[in-house]
Amino acid sequence: MLYNLLLPHIHNSHIANLFHYITFRSGLAIIITLSLSFITGPILIEFLRSIQKNGQPIRSDGPESHQTKVGTPTMGGIMIILSSCLSTLLLADLTNKYIWITLFGFISFGIIGFMDDYAKVTKNNHYGVRGKSKLLLQGIISVIICVLLEYLDKSPSHLLNVPFFKNLSLDLGYCYIVFAIFVIVGSSNAVNLTDGLDGLATVPIAFTAGSFALISYLVGNLIYSNYLQLTYIPNTGELTVLCAGLVGSCLGFLWFNAQPAEVFMGDTGSLSLGGVLGIISVITKHEIVLAIVGGLFVIETASVILQVYYFKATKGKRIFKMAPLHHHFEKHGWAESKVVIRFWIISVIFALIGLSSLKLR
């Protein structure tokens, strides 16, 4: 909004001219979301605590140390969604179609997560909304997003770019739409599975959002995209502002979510954040890079899939002591803080590998 209001005065005012630069608005987005989180965090946490008598239900079959988390409120993802959306509406170009499509998906996935968290809190169990119902709703939202992208793009690309290889891309035709839906839904649920310890998912999400802030900026810049031999996609640069807002809001949330957590982001946060990262990867045509940068999410998801299929195939045997993988290490005796920090280190490594694909090809 500020960008659109100041746009006519860019050449007449030095301050207005600053808003012409995506980098300036992105930095400002981080500052705004951090500030909003610090200011509204205590108020929101106290409100959630007052309306949630027992907080987020804790699994009885989980690590014993988790019983100390009883009474911790959930739905903290509301803080992330509100601060990110507000900074985006203030600083991004509101005539940009990608901004509105991404915000639509972000909020929609947040609503699905809120419904799940609400069901858990009111029923006082950790099951919430049925898995198939959530998948159906996620699928519907993803279909709408993909149809919008297909309809609004004058010449939509169905190419899947392969990182680390020069000029290597796969033409999926209209099957690309199915693939894009899979990416968005898969990303949403992968982040959700990772969010099982205090602060565990928050930092990797921030790393991934930061990586895609850079990717969005490069892909939306004709000079940089040509130099790096990336597919140039006009107007994606504005997503840098949104991604920067995600980074700031996640760091602000971490202030309250660090062990021992004062609040959990819940499915409200994890489903929305995973979904928005998937949407941005589809828009920027860096779906495979998302799987690399967010490699920790992939590993956590794979551990659950392997555990379920192995359990069924062997009629009761398990590969891991508990899935997702972070619980396996807890069952092995690792302290929660050690699991979290080591997984953060892994996510940094994956982010660096993913970003290196922009140049190494």
UniProtKB/Swiss-Prot annotation:
Pathway(s) served: Cell wall biogenesis; peptidoglycan biosynthesis
One Pfam family of this chain: Glycos_transf_4
Gene source species: Rickettsia rickettsii (strain Sheila Smith)
Protein name per Swiss-Prot or TrEMBL: Phospho-N-acetylmuramoyl-pentapeptide-transferase
Entry keyword annotation includes Transmembrane: yes
Transmembrane regions listed in the UniProt entry: 28-48, 74-94, 99-119, 133-153, 168-188, 203-223, 236-256, 263-283, 288-308, 338-358
GO molecular function, one term: metal ion binding
Any one of the GO BP annotations: peptidoglycan biosynthetic process
PANTHER family named among the record's database cross-references: PHOSPHO-N-ACETYLMURAMOYL-PENTAPEPTIDE-TRANSFERASE, PHOSPHO-N-ACETYLMURAMOYL-PENTAPEPTIDE-TRANSFERASE HOMOLOG
Catalytic activity: UDP-N-acetyl-alpha-D-muramoyl-L-alanyl-gamma-D-glutamyl-meso-2,6-diaminopimeloyl-D-alanyl-D-alanine + di-trans,octa-cis-undecaprenyl phosphate = di-trans,octa-cis-undecaprenyl diphospho-N-acetyl-alpha-D-muramoyl-L-alanyl-D-glutamyl-meso-2,6-diaminopimeloyl-D-alanyl-D-alanine + UMP
Required cofactor(s): Mg(2+)
